[in-house]
Amino acid sequence: RLKKTRLLMQEKELEMLLVTSPHNFRYFTGFDSYFWESPTRPWFLLLSLNHDPIAIIPSIGKTALQKTWIKNINAWQSPNPNDEGITTLQDTILSIKSNKCSIGCEMGMESHLRMSINDFQKLNTNLANHSFVDASSLIWKLRMIKSKNEISKLKQIISIASNVFDQLPKHLQIDQSEIEICNIMKKKLLDLGADHTLYMSC
């Protein structure tokens, strides 16, 4: 994934890619956690053309992230409402490239920056020689083509979900609400091997 990302970065003339959203952080690091359920503190991943990936994260997550393949982790002491990682992120960017460069961010279709607007504006101001540009199309292009391993995992979870749908009528009663039915389905998904159910419409 990193190799393909760098090729796309070269095409887009990007020297760095700043990842902030949980699903893309998970995609590049393999790290999955309920830390994402709290929007209080951001987590950053910085990919560059010529350096190993660097994670910039709150100190509470360092031990867990060290179990992944990411070896460069810059952590700040958190909670720190006055500076939740922005100075650490800024210093990390400058350590890679102190002069002008283009940094891709998740700013386009179905994307978002998982940081406050004030912090992003502060980052732009403090790194005036650097430009932050939309790289969502790069990430979309990268993620649309699945590897054999990804396809295998998709087949597995689709099979689990299909089995739950098939079995669901056996566990339902006439007087149950939609919420109760959804809760039954969530439990059955977990029982059959799903990791979790983040979203279910009812």
Cite the ranges covered by each PLM segment:
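Active-site cofactor/co-catalyst pockets and adjacent glycine-rich loops in catalytic enzymes
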Residues: P22, F28-D32, P39, L49, ...
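Flexible, acidic/His-enriched mid-domain "rim/lid" segments that flank
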Residues: L2, P81-T197
